[in-house]
UniProtKB/Swiss-Prot annotation:
Stated name of the protein: Leucine--tRNA ligase
Catalysed reaction equations from the record: tRNA(Leu) + L-leucine + ATP = L-leucyl-tRNA(Leu) + AMP + diphosphate
Classification of source organism: Bacteria, Bacillati, Bacillota, Clostridia, Eubacteriales
Family: Belongs to the class-I aminoacyl-tRNA synthetase family.
GO biological process: leucyl-tRNA aminoacylation
Residues that coordinate or bind ATP: K586
CDD domains recorded: Anticodon_Ia_Leu_BEm (cd07958), LeuRS_core (cd00812)
UniProt xrefs under SUPFAM superfamilies: Anticodon-binding domain of a subclass of class I aminoacyl-tRNA synthetases, Nucleotidylyl transferase, ValRS/IleRS/LeuRS editing domain
Amino acid sequence: MQEKYLFSEIEPKWQKKWVDRKDYQAEEHSDKPKFYALAMFPYPSGNLHMGHVRNYSIVDVIARFKRMRGYNVLHPIGWDSFGLPAENAAIKNQTPPAEWTWKNIANMKRQLQEMGISYDWEREVTTCHPDYYKFTQWIFLEFYKHGLVYKKKAGVNWCPSCATVLANEQVVDGACERCDTAVTKKDLEQWFFKITDYAQVLLDDLEKLPGWPDKVKTMQKNWIGRSEGAEVEFDLENHGDKIRVYTTRVDTIFGVSYVVLAPEHPLVQKLIAGTEYENDVQAFIERMKGLNEIARTSTETEKEGLFTGAYCINPYSGEKVPIWIANYVLFEYGTGAVMGVPAHDERDFEFAGKYKLPIKTVILPEGTPVEEKDTPLQAAFVEEGMMVNSGEYDGLKNVEAWEKMCDKAEHDGFGERKVNFRLRDWLISRQRYWGAPIPMIYCDHCGIVPVPQDQLPVMLPDDVVFKAGENPLTTSESFKQTICPTCGGKARRETDTMDTFMCSSWYFLRYTDPHNAQLPFAKEAADHWMNVDQYVGGVEHAILHLLYSRFFTKALRDFGYLKVDEPFANLLTQGMVCLGGAKMSKSKGNVVSPEEIISKYGADTARLFILFAAPPERDLEWNDQGVEGCYRFLNRVWRLAAQYEEVLKTTGAGANEFGELDKAAKDMRRQTHQTIQRVTSDVGARFNFNTAVSAIMELVNALYLYKEQPQVNLAVAREALESILILLAPFAPHITEEIWSELGHEDSIHSREWPQVDEEALVQEEVTVVLQINGKVKERIQVPAQISAAELEAQVRQLPRLGEWTQGKQILKIVTVPGKLVNVVVK
């Protein structure tokens, strides 16, 4: 071995060998159990950041560990390569998005290979390649064929800066999640996926995912937002129409003091036409048009409303109720109408107080005298209680009244029980170029016609003009003009492209069969590899990507293309990489470049630090001293191997070659097998990579000390050193591969079997017991491992120094914990 650890020579050498030998290709036909390890694939922004390094290092440890445990591992990588940054770069630099994207992919691929990640590069996918988006279009058509895609005019979230529509999930606090521009409302014809058809099963099947973090499942539950309530009709006064209201609190309906319509509700125009209220209401409606959903419904937003001049009739009490419009009611949610019950809803209480509307109590806390039913409230009462001011339902518990009132609505025909979901259908249309074209055609004779599957892919054209605020595909006549596949007449192509989440909602399926030219994947291949056994990515994808991927998987199962109905069996959401207490980002100027760290210390050091510095699910604080420490540790491993190299090359390590072991050799073997046991558990069961690395470091220290013994059992030393290398291999693959080779092994360390724990080696003949006097440590004593409590107490009483420590005091009792401590209680 060379005297110095030269990572700059070692790492490229092994990276090339691994690729040339195709060491990490998954086996197509194998008797081994399968394991599918996957990190969320990256957007090719141009350079890896430390968040990438952490994500991919975590999955690589898992993949390498599973290979060594006898699994046939699928560990692929690809590029989520459509999206706005490429298009914005095209506008700014006059560079075609494809050119910008492929250049970035080449650079990031080089960086990934320099990290030594054990990818099966034969399965690499790129979503902007026609061979890939052909099948994104194919999947769109399958969903369309099965009635899960439709087009409608809708008030959509519009980002003026990005000049495109945003899904509800892409609006954060009223702003575009990408550029932070305030989002407005705009009416456009858009394509939608009917994810709401799967709302209930998406909710129910979260119970099938014990390997997912509770936080992520809760976020999805809240986003789906299932509620059980009733829809009831309020007749309009002097009018033939009705207002349908959805409520989860039909038990409070006798307390309704107003009904609110969304400003966009079609009834509003009928109610105000020709009245004295028309102008003011129209002005209010116009003002609402410029506001997006979040801005209108946020708890921070002041509730605004206006009386329409019209009234409706409460179907239970027969009372006349004023009709208002307000900013917080959205036409897209429920029925676009809500009933206002100020006494029992905090928002309604606030609204009624502002506009001096009546507040009528209809539920009292249990035990409250009925005489207090009309006492003015200081705040809304939202708990359960007894019904008052509610006609025939007075005296009932409100939960009983809820059922009876629903029964009445259904019996009398003015309402019914109803389950509602917060989840909306997925709007996938984007007015941008760099996305998969929507494979639909508009014909004046035939209407909307899907592109035949044998004509896919619908390719992105090159003859487009990039201008801020304009959809580039509308500038390409060669793209727009086409022939109707049904009648052969002139027709126009759809010029919107798909949301990039369309491509990332099925990429994990393409990895199972990436070179299939006829189908997105063969059922046999997908059924073999799916589910993904371990998925790793940021919690910021909890709703969008993870929900859409679950939806796609369930639908494709229903279409007959898959056996599984959940894509990811286990999910790990890794923490952020921080510097100075804040997430690394260019805008904060606190970025550490992976390339700089790798060039200075090597990829193994970068990997080791990022895995050692914190548990994977926690945020990691970057620390230069910690990086230096990991580099020094790898140098210690190198020097340790160099010191043992010559003698170990000629020494076997068979089970029968240890011979008679002295105490030092037994202790060394015990620590070796304790470390094997601990690392196996930490990596395999808990992903506690930091404690696994710590255990390996302790074993290295122990082997250094063992080397100083007067007599070294070389078989024991070899077992310890080889165990160190194998246990360290998933974390630091290059240095361990090099040392393994230098020790005379011809096979790759990464193809070695993971070491087994020798239970006999774990048996201790002696243990160290702590001796305390009134809880204060006085001494540590060696005793037989199997000593009983009585024997331990007797041995302590015979200690010469016990009299010295207890002089002038009375021994009250001696508490023993065999194998751990003895506490002598005195006064």
